[in-house]
Each structure stands twice: as structure tokens, then as C-alpha cells.
Amino acid sequence: MAHKKGTGSTRNGRDSNAQRLGVKRFGGEVVKAGYILVRQRGTKFHPGVNVARGGDDTLFATIAGVVTFERYGKNRKRVSVYPLEG
């Protein structure tokens, strides 16, 4: 027999809220300046052409244009925004 009180359910029951990270605008999408492209922790994606990085590593567009995801270097990815022609 157990000589200590089972305290499983009273000591559990906590969880943190989801951080809602991830890609918010995908390749080929047309965006305006200021649109958030990727929410991330660290630099899973690096900022490319016409993309800036916020204080929490969020990537956002600095001009209106089309989003592209590119590989550069051996194992890095970057997000760029190129202006629309026309």
C-alpha cells in the first residue's frame, strides 16, 4: 500500500499558450510593405532582399512585391521580396 497521498492531478494542470510561430506569407504571394512574412525564434529563415528582421526575429517586408523563399550557402534559407513588374 502507498503511504503517501497520490498528488498527480493537483500538481498538474498547467500549460503555456501556443506562440503562433511559422510562415505567415508563402512564396508567390503578393505583399505590401510591413506585412509579416515569418514569425520565428532565432534565425530559421534569414532576411533577404527587401526584408528586415524585427527584435523578436520576425521577418517583415520593407516594400510591396512578391515573396520568394531561397536557399543560400550550404544550409541556410532566406526570404526576399521582389517588386512587381508593371
UniProtKB/Swiss-Prot annotation:
Family: Belongs to the bacterial ribosomal protein bL27 family.
HAMAP family with a match to the protein in the record: Ribosomal_bL27
PROSITE patterns: RIBOSOMAL_L27
Gene: rpmA
Keywords for the protein's UniProt record, in alphabetical order: Ribonucleoprotein, Ribosomal protein
Polar residues: compositionally biased ranges: 7-19
Pfam families from the UniProt entry: Ribosomal_L27 (PF01016)
GO cellular component: cytosolic large ribosomal subunit
The protein's name: Large ribosomal subunit protein bL27
Residue numbers spanned by region Disordered: 1-21
Alphabetized Gene3D superfamilies for the sequence: 2.40.50.100
GO biological process per UniProt: translation
Species of the source: Thermosynechococcus vestitus (strain NIES-2133 / IAM M-273 / BP-1)
GO molecular function terms attached to this record: structural constituent of ribosome
